[in-house]
Amino acid sequence: EKSGATVILFDGNEKLHEEAIRMKLPSASKAQILIGQISDEQLKELDLVVLSPGVPTDLPVVEKMKAAGIRIWGEVELAYENAKGDVLAITGTNGKTTTTSLLGEIMKCWKESVYVVGNIGNPYTQAAPKMTEESVTVAEISSFQLETIDQFHPKVSAILNITPDHL
């Protein structure tokens, strides 16, 4: 909403109530809320869909959005679009959190403005508005988060290891 975009919140859970959603998300007071189904007409209004973390990309409604040519982003892509500074990204099957934390501490010895974000529990989107060109972001990126990136292009990336469950 701050960027001038029209925001539509959608949840396929028909048991949800709009009032409950608005209470949990007071910052989305101007957003349109759709619950249950999304029509073909409503799909035509969408330019971009940002999936909440944990929403599978193979859900029928997401597949329908992809088939309609709508860009599908995750939280990482949305944050990257609005962040500044250099990004160091860590992915792989095991050791991501330890490596991300260690690299974050090393970077803090070198730079004042360091953000450790991503799958480590600190949302990238919360840190992005605070960043400057001098900032360094150390991001733990899961295999699921990699499915919903488009332009995310870290300055440095590391793939720690890959086991069959991540292929």
Explain the meaning of each model-derived region.
Residues 1-74, 78:
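N-terminal leader/targeting and accessory segments in enzymes
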Residues 41-44, 53-167:
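Phosphate-binding loop of NTP-binding sites
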